[in-house]
Regions:
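Active-site hotspot residues in diverse enzymes, especially metal/ion-binding acidic/histidine motifs
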Residues: 1-166
Length: 166
């Protein structure tokens, strides 16, 4: 693993879009009083605060992942939450500003930001900032942990190549 962080966080998303998504994430974490990992995404979907969106049980998957994909459903639930927020006039009126329309890339970025908040990952001890450790601590796939580390300009394994569509 390369021990030197990148000079700048990397993302293909425009800075304004990233900033809006980060403000949205911080507002959600504050409203749900979530202060440590793992983010309770299933509870957030099932229990919308102040009626900001409608919880549709038919849209929420209760399938458990397994093996290397055991945390993939959490990312899917976070992406669903973004879509529900973006479709909700009440959420917009309540100050939860979701950029819309956005690319699939932006929705994936939201999911990673929500499940792996920047402040939390930066607060980890350096030995806990490995893809495998981040995966376990935040309950996300190792793949998404790698992408998030790269987005934040944190040390990455030297042999990791991140697809350009992320």
């Amino acid at each position: 693993m390369d021990s030197t962080p990148n000079a700048e966080p990397t993302s293909a998303l425009p800075p304004k879009t990233r900033a809006r998504i980060n403000r949205l994430v911080n507002a959600l974490l504050e409203r749900y009083q979530v202060t440590e990992p793992p983010v309770p995404i299933e509870r957030m979907l099932k229990q919308p605060l102040d009626g900001l969106w409608e919880a549709h049980p038919s849209q929420i998957s209760f399938i458990m992942g397994h093996g290397i994909y055991r945390y993939a459903p959490r990312l899917a639930e976070a992406r669903l939450l973004y879509r529900m927020l973006s479709d909700s006039p009440t959420a917009r009126e309540g100050g939860l500003d979701t950029p819309w329309p956005v690319s699939r890339r932006a929705i994936k970025y939201f999911a990673r930001c929500l499940l792996i908040p920047e402040e939390w990952i930066r607060a980890l001890r350096p030995p806990d900032r490995t893809p495998d450790a981040v995966s376990e601590i935040f309950q996300v796939t190792t793949y998404d942990a790698i992408i998030r580390l790269a987005e934040l300009g944190l040390p990455m394994p030297a042999d990791v190549v991140i697809p350009s569509d992320e």
